[in-house]
UniProtKB/Swiss-Prot annotation:
<comment type="function">
    <text>Mitochondrial HMG-box protein that limits the copy number of mitochondrial DNA (mtDNA), antagonizing HMG-box containing protein ABF2, a mtDNA packaging factor.</text>
</comment>
<keyword id="KW-0677">Repeat</keyword>
<feature type="region of interest" description="HMG-box A">
    <location>
        <begin position="27"/>
        <end position="102"/>
    </location>
</feature>
<dbReference type="GO" id="GO:0005759">
    <property type="term" value="C:mitochondrial matrix"/>
</dbReference>
<feature type="transit peptide" description="Mitochondrion">
    <location>
        <begin position="1"/>
        <end position="90"/>
    </location>
</feature>
<keyword id="KW-0809">Transit peptide</keyword>
<keyword id="KW-0496">Mitochondrion</keyword>
<protein>
    <recommendedName>
        <fullName>Mitochondrial HMG-box protein CIM1</fullName>
    </recommendedName>
</protein>
<dbReference type="GO" id="GO:0000002">
    <property type="term" value="P:mitochondrial genome maintenance"/>
</dbReference>
<feature type="region of interest" description="HMG-box B">
    <location>
        <begin position="110"/>
        <end position="258"/>
    </location>
</feature>
């Protein structure tokens, strides 16, 4: 047999904006408590179903993950705190030394904005997206099928100057970037990937436009008194966050001590038979902590 130096390879359609996001993708351990909960839900499927059925059900199935997310969001706080303790114990998270911001991210607890401008931008983005969605709904009602004329007209609207489009105190201006719809009639993987990339490009372009509009509104339309009021709200939010995290850490430490006292921590791991299992986020599934029956 003669060896060949030909290497068959192709570019991946997946793109990463930062080095940290790429490294996080390589790390398959669950980063948040919900990802840990999702692992346990997939593990239940491994216990009661065939491997082939699990692959077909989980791989590329957003409905299953949406179902798990609804279960997680509707879960009581007491039960969710038990998952918090199980997650931190399984991932060896030092809750006393890790920063409160990092711990809140791992537990998916809302954290305060880093600055007054970011707090303003969060509110601005909500209204910006709402206004953009309303324009899209009006466009769908007026024109059933997107045409070149409509796209040109939308582009002309987006290219108006600042003097023709007045800015409100917080409300986003009407100079928006149109989004390109993905056609559902194209079923091939190549066309779908191309349309998805175009949609992602348009979304990033709209986000950049939102940041530009928000910066203009912050510098030109928000006066000193309004900025001072935003600063006071942020200070109150940070104080409540510190108090809430102190309480959560105490409860978390108590639950972890109880689990360790009764020997509820398991070092057993269930490994998927196929490394291509797309369980997202991990194909090494830790055993759950089983509560002893009274």
């Amino acid at each position: 047999m003669k060896a060949t130096l030909l290497l068959k390879a192709q570019l991946s359609p997946v793109s990463y904006t930062t080095k940290k996001s790429f490294q996080r993708q390589l790390n398959r351990t669950p980063y948040t408590a919900f990802q840990y909960f999702f692992q346990l839900e997939v593990q239940k499927l491994h216990n009661v179903s065939k491997y082939e059925d699990i692959i077909n059900h989980v791989r590329g199935n957003s409905n299953f993950k949406r179902f798990a997310r609804n279960e997680w969001d509707s879960m009581s706080l007491t039960k969710k705190r038990l998952y918090y303790a199980s997650f931190c114990q399984s991932m060896d998270i030092d809750i006393l030394n890790v920063s409160k911001i990092e711990l809140a991210k791992r537990l998916e607890i809302p954290i305060p904005a880093m600055s007054e401008y970011l707090l303003f931008r969060n509110k601005f983005k909500v209204k910006f997206d709402s206004h953009c969605s309303s324009l899209e709904r009006k466009d769908r009602k007026s024109v059933p099928r997107p045409s070149i004329t409509r796209k040109v007209a939308t582009t002309e609207i987006c290219s108006k100057s600042r003097s023709n489009t007045p800015v409100g105190k917080i409300n986003p201006r009407k100079r928006l970037v149109a989004l390109k719809r993905i056609s559902r009639s194209e079923n091939t993987a190549k066309n779908h990937s191309h349309e998805a990339q175009n949609y992602l490009y348009d979304y990033m372009k709209r986000f950049q436009q939102m940041c530009k509009e928000c910066r203009y509104a912050w510098n030109e339309e928000v006066d000193y008194d309004q900025k001072l009021e935003i600063r006071k709200k942020l200070q109150v939010w940070r104080a409540k966050f510190e108090e809430m995290m102190d309480n959560e850490i105490q409860i978390l430490q108590k639950n972890m001590d109880i689990m360790s006292k009764f020997g509820l921590r398991s070092e057993s791991y269930l490994t998927a038979a196929n490394h291509d299992t797309n369980t997202q986020p991990n194909n090494i599934l830790p055993m759950t902590y089983l509560l002893k029956k009274k």
